[in-house]
Amino acid sequence: MRRNMGFGLVALALAVAGLVYYLVRPLSVEPSPAEFHCYDLDDGVYAPLETPGQAFGIGLAYAGHIRETASEFNPDGIPPVFTKSPQATVRTDADLRLPTPDALFDAADAIEPGLGDTLRSDFPNLSPLLDYEVEMGFVLLEDIDPSQLNDPTFSPKLGFFIANDVSARSLAILGEGKPNRYDYWGASKSLPGFMPLADKAWTPETAEPNGIPCVEIETIVNGEVRQHQSTEDLIYTPLQMLRFIHAEFPEVALDEGTVVLSGTPGGVAMTTPRWLVRLGNLFGLSRLKKLSAKLGADTSRFLRVGDRVTARGQGLGKVTVTVVP
């Protein structure tokens, strides 16, 4: 009997050790920055940035943001790619209206009919969990033929600028476990005022393969620096991002004036310990349970009415918005 008890204790210890390893194990592959040609900002010109005809976003493009959101990384896969509504564009000193629960319910219904009614019942006072994301964006200065994207030496003509990829995280969470998960991301980033863009874009005199302005970008909320990172730490080049967009949206033409937001560094309000995410997945928590857990946790770093938010980049200008009711 003692021998059986001993075997049982050993089995229990092994099971606990296995669970702990599952919860805290590191990423199988650590993300690393791409290799860039760093432009000299003195060798270029500034031009007005027009409101885009179409806009895309790339997610999880900095290692720090992958870690803080407990996301996975596949170096051979395509990162999150989503569309943003051009109608969400605003400029510096604009008011950023905090979405009401009804606005969130309507946005949820637009992407998944009936979801809004579920949210009205379960979360009548739903918070948007409003978040900030400083990003270096780029605009296409010419139409791009998809066949050009397969040439590693292709140097698309781009203009670079600063943007704030504002997000309603409560909507994004609802995509958990859905095959079209990143459509929910796009919806969460396309509410009115959710794409503050700088007024001007910087363009190099000569386009170089994998060329970008290697500059420091940051988000400041009420005078506090929340994000600060060099664009040189991006995991993907603009050419790779355009390939990803074409792979996910092959029917969409990459026309002149298209805007791409290249991803945000670490420091956003939406952070989750990796072990907690894995534990939730282990127990099969539904997306609504995950949303409830996030709403019940500390939400003090999410944006509130009265907050003044500036996204800026060295040599690329800035865009400031104020959250209003």
Question: What does each model-identified segment do?
Answer:
Residues V260-L261, V309:
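Generic structural signal for buried aliphatic residues
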Residues Y22-H228, Y236-L239, D255:
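Active-site microenvironments in enzyme catalytic cores
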Residues M1-A13:
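N-terminal Sec-pathway targeting helices
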Residues L14-L23:
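Hydrophobic alpha-helical membrane-insertion segments, chiefly the h-region
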Residues T89-V90, S188, Q229-Q240, V259, ...:
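Short, basic/aromatic beta-hairpin or loop at an interaction surface
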Residues P99-F105, P192, P196, E232, ...:
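Charged, cofactor-coupling segments
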Residues E256-G257, G306:
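Loop/turn positions that initiate beta-strands
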Residues A253-L254, L303:
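Short, well-ordered loop/turn sites that connect or cap secondary structure elements
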